[in-house]
């Protein structure tokens, strides 16, 4: 059990740092491209991991830990609220559509591709 917690912690530490890098580099305009990038790529990668049916150790380290910290639901919601408050309604709709539609599509694609590595 302690080893599982350590795996999640190590993965989470690394994932959070990488997400911070993406946010700092890409979230400079009206559309939060950094958050969009981490959430879409995270959906794809987690789908691929699920499709590949990886070991518990790998899933804890990379799935729960790294990708759990790399992707972000709370920042997404804050940025969506900020777009609405700034009356950026078109960007809000675009961001929401790409995030949810793209995330679901990429998770399915990742799962499908990952299943070839079982």
Swiss-Prot record:
Na(+) is not transported, but it plays an essential structural role and its presence is essential for fluoride channel function. It is a multi-pass membrane protein. GO terms for cellular component: plasma membrane. GO terms for biological process: cellular detoxification of fluoride. GO terms for molecular function: fluoride channel activity; metal ion binding. The chain crosses the membrane at residues 2-22, 31-51, 56-76, 91-111. This is Fluoride-specific ion channel FluC 2. It comes from Desulfitobacterium hafniense (strain Y51). The lineage of its organism: Bacteria, Bacillati, Bacillota, Clostridia, Eubacteriales. The gene is fluC2.
